[in-house]
């Protein structure tokens, strides 16, 4: 068996080059076998692109990244036009290679020590009141990137004292306690970590991750910060059943998670995992009722819902779908 070529620092691997490095073989999807996208997934583009252009220019001029662009989010136009963005720190190259995700895999560069200040200034200039900070996985760092998260939160609050900050963190594999110790110095207003799918589908969808580790991360943060909401998100369409998703919801509540996002998986390219089903808006509505009955303080459930989609409205308890 031929070994993959050694990764070069800063080189992005995408699509076929990325998924070739996972343990489950994925055959490229043929157009005739791909499920037809239903009408309810058609995204309406805004009348004006001015605000979108302004946000993209602000990101470029400061050398910053948004997960909206890097992960090819279908809501990019709506969110940018609304004046919101989810900032992705620690670079745009992930040490993991999840085949549902469009973020590039590779060997990341050293973290930018100036990024926390640049991020804080950009948020101030954009006059944002609620921000979501996420990152790629950084298994190459001894703390998984936790100190960089804490530094960003500190600098953002220094320049934006009235802002609310939500962090969407990786799983800090093997470093949970170290990471939580560091994050305790500057905790966010909402702590988010996505389980993504049911445990039976982790090997194909989240190679390198562990379902129980992710639950433990959410639980341990809540134990340290009982008054800070915890949140998690799931995708549907990766081969799971509704019954499996309901069990995940029960597991999340058993680990004291307060907020939920549930959305439709969309295949970024023919080289990624195929969509195995499109879940109807009615099914999402039914799952929302179940989530609320289980005790989630807020559940955003709908085909185009993503973990940071209208996160400010989610935090206010307003309906998002």
Swiss-Prot record:
Reactions catalysed, as given in the entry: [[Fe-S] cluster scaffold protein carrying a second [4Fe-4S](2+) cluster] + N(6)-octanoyl-L-lysyl-[protein] + 2 oxidized [2Fe-2S]-[ferredoxin] + 2 S-adenosyl-L-methionine + 4 H(+) = [[Fe-S] cluster scaffold protein] + N(6)-[(R)-dihydrolipoyl]-L-lysyl-[protein] + 4 Fe(3+) + 2 hydrogen sulfide + 2 5'-deoxyadenosine + 2 L-methionine + 2 reduced [2Fe-2S]-[ferredoxin]
Main localization, broad class: cytoplasm
InterPro entries: Aldolase_TIM (IPR013785), Elp3/MiaA/NifB-like_rSAM (IPR006638), LIAS_N (IPR031691), Lipoyl_synth (IPR003698), rSAM (IPR007197)
A Pfam entry, by short name: LIAS_N
UniProt-annotated binding residues for [4Fe-4S] cluster 2: 94, 98, 101
Required cofactor names: [4Fe-4S] cluster
Pathway the protein takes part in: Protein modification; protein lipoylation via endogenous pathway; protein N(6)-(lipoyl)lysine from octanoyl-[acyl-carrier-protein]: step 2/2
Entry-linked SMART domains: Elp3 (SM00729)
Entry GO CC: cytoplasm
Keywords: 4Fe-4S, Cytoplasm, Iron, Iron-sulfur, Metal-binding, S-adenosyl-L-methionine, Transferase
Cofactor stoichiometry and binding remark: Binds 2 [4Fe-4S] clusters per subunit. One cluster is coordinated with 3 cysteines and an exchangeable S-adenosyl-L-methionine.
Radical SAM core domain residues: 80-297
Uppermost EC category: transferase
Location(s) in or outside the cell: Cytoplasm
Known EC number: 2.8.1.8
Protein family: Belongs to the radical SAM superfamily. Lipoyl synthase family.
Protein name: Lipoyl synthase
Classification lineage: Bacteria, Pseudomonadati, Pseudomonadota, Gammaproteobacteria, Alteromonadales
